Design a protein with these regions (language model features):
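Bacterial N-terminal signal peptides that target proteins for export
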Residues: 2-14
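Catalytic, metal-anchored helix/loop core of enzyme active sites in primary metabolism
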Residues: 170
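Extended, subdomain-level signal for the structured scaffold at the beginning of enzyme domains
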Residues: 26-162, 166, 174-268
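Bacterial N-terminal signal peptides
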Residues: 11-24
Length: 268
């Protein structure tokens, strides 16, 4: 029986078409797998103080605005998800409101962002979130509620021991003075650390108002304290602990956090 040319062509082409279909399907599946393997954005917590009174002076205090707005700007530019936390949750009072600072002005003009500082999430409610980094903003208020808060200490230990970055600036390192690892060692022990210095506290005439001298306390915990001249930038990076001396250091601390996070392999 003679086979028609068209039938012969179909017979020869069919295996090729099947093979092409299989290759295309495999490529599609590979592409889908690659897309699903893209790492989610990093997630960072900025922790603010709830404390609003400067000791017995009846003067207001809180978190120092630029020490939150400058890091927020850096983390936002890096594409990170950012949560605002505080020890108790709810309002975190602002201090150091200076609209001549562009980062402050942009933050204050964003009603949604300002609202988030008035309704922060309590650290206790955020403990199940796998943060890549936690950043403790400064401000004198931190000297009263950060050091002895169990949720602050637990958050630091959890993030650090999971391989994340712990960061703080100015008076934010008040969160570190009682923070211990599971081994019982202070996190700051034998690490380079910077913070608002005792000399700077004297310069702003608040050494008799704050409950303790931050630099001295960190040194007592075994930190290798490093500093710049008063009110000049100083950032210390020691393993996955990043600290800064004062408001001038806030951007540098955040940039160092980003550098550490971006150096990690995807999924690590």
């Amino acid at each position: 029986m003679l086979t028609s040319p068209s039938h012969l062509i179909r017979t020869l082409l069919l295996p090729c078409l099947v093979l092409l279909g299989l290759v295309g399907c495999a490529a599609s599946q590979s592409s889908s797998a690659g897309a699903s393997a893209v790492a989610p954005p990093k997630r960072v917590a900025i922790v603010l103080t709830n404390h609003g009174q400067l000791g017995d002076t009846e003067k207001p205090t809180g978190f120092y605005l630029s020490e939150a707005t400058h890091p927020y700007e850096v983390f936002h530019k890096a594409g990170y998800e950012i949560d605002f936390l505080s020890p108790k949750g709810g309002e975190a009072p602002m201090d150091g409101v200076d609209r001549s600072d562009p980062a402050n002005a942009a933050f204050l003009d964003d009603e949604a962002l300002v609202a988030r500082t008035k309704s922060t999430t309590s650290i206790a409610k955020a403990m199940t979130v796998p943060y890549d980094a936690v950043f403790f903003a400064g401000g004198h208020g931190t000297m009263w509620d950060f050091p002895d808060d169990p949720s602050v200490q637990r958050l630091i230990r959890t993030v650090y021991e999971r391989g994340g970055v712990v960061a703080a600036v100015c008076h934010g390192p008040a969160a570190l003075v009682n923070a211990r690892l599971s081994s019982g060692m202070y996190l700051v022990a034998d690490k380079q650390v910077s913070a608002f210095t005792d000399e700077e506290e004297i310069a702003v005439k608040l050494e008799a108002v704050v409950p303790f001298a931050l630099e001295s306390k960190l040194r007592a915990r075994g930190a290798r304290f490093v500093e710049a001249p008063n009110f000049e930038k100083k950032v210390a990076v020691s393993e996955r602990l990043v600290t800064g001396q004062n408001p001038a250091s806030a951007t540098g601390v955040a940039e160092a956090v980003v550098e550490l996070l971006e150096a990690r392999r995807p999924g690590v």
